[in-house]
Amino acid sequence: MTSKTVFQNAFKTFLDFAINSLPSTQGGLNITATAPGGVGQRPFTNKAGVLKLIFVSASSLYIGGLIAHKGASYLEENEIFVPTDEDDDD
């Protein structure tokens, strides 16, 4: 279906709903709309979607961890942030 026919069908459905929800009057309006065509094609499914999701998630976590590790070692090496050796567990 093209976007034009989808819009037309949606608009016809909206008009039917709006007209049917109005209180009835003596004159009355009879408007009917029928959608042309039947069932469309089956939608596209991605067969390797879960595999791609796992690959992207794992690689992103690995690269993020690597960047964090390199950043922390840089900060400690240049003495910008050095964790204290005090034991607060006493």
UniProtKB/Swiss-Prot annotation:
Q: Does the keyword Membrane apply?
A: yes
Q: Where is the signal peptide, in residue numbers?
A: none
Question: Could you tell me the keywords of this UniProt record?
Answer: Calcium, Calcium transport, Ion transport, Membrane, Mitochondrion, Mitochondrion inner membrane, Transit peptide, Transmembrane, Transmembrane helix, Transport
Q: Name one GO cellular component term.
A: uniplex complex
Question: What PANTHER family does the annotation carry?
Answer: ESSENTIAL MCU REGULATOR, MITOCHONDRIAL (PTHR33904:SF1)
The function of this protein is: Essential regulatory subunit of the mitochondrial calcium uniporter (mcu-1) channel, a protein that mediates calcium uptake into mitochondria.
Q: Which family does it belong to?
A: Belongs to the SMDT1/EMRE family.
> Could you tell me what this protein is called?
Essential MCU regulator, mitochondrial
